[in-house]
A protein has these predicted regions:
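Membrane-interface extramembranous regions
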Residues: 1-122
Length: 122
């Protein structure tokens, strides 16, 4: 179980960092509506620019906290970080529903939500 928990933390944290730092301005088939960048995706959902910035800061901070939890488990960061990220994924799923995206566009949020639940429950 320790190996599974480690894998979940790494995949979630590195995935979030990849999306928000490395691929923020690159198109993917999972962006809402016809958005080509993360900023455009938030605009497509009808959200102001400050929400894009705030969500980015929070998600990167939570991903870093998950990574810290690997080396400093005594800080007890894993479960609260995963719970918060899971909540953000629920909101992301709601945004995809709001703009009536095809179900496939919700897949990354659903998978990250499942992995976050795994972290919380393990």
């Amino acid at each position: 179980m320790e190996n599974l928990l480690l894998a979940l933390k790494l995949v979630v944290a590195l995935g979030i960092l990849n999306v928000w730092i490395v691929r923020r301005v690159q198109p993917t088939p999972f962006r809402g509506q016809s958005a080509q960048t993360l900023r455009e995706e938030f605009t497509a959902y009808g959200l102001p620019d400050w929400v894009f910035k705030a969500v980015g800061v929070v998600k990167v901070a939570l991903a870093v906290a998950l990574l810290i939890s690997i080396w400093k488990p005594e800080l007890k960061l894993a479960q609260p970080s995963a719970l918060a990220l899971g909540g953000i994924m629920v909101v992301a799923l709601g945004m995809h529903l709001k703009v009536r995206d095809p179900a496939i566009k919700s897949l990354p949020a659903l998978v990250v939500l499942a992995m976050c639940l795994g972290i919380v429950l393990l």
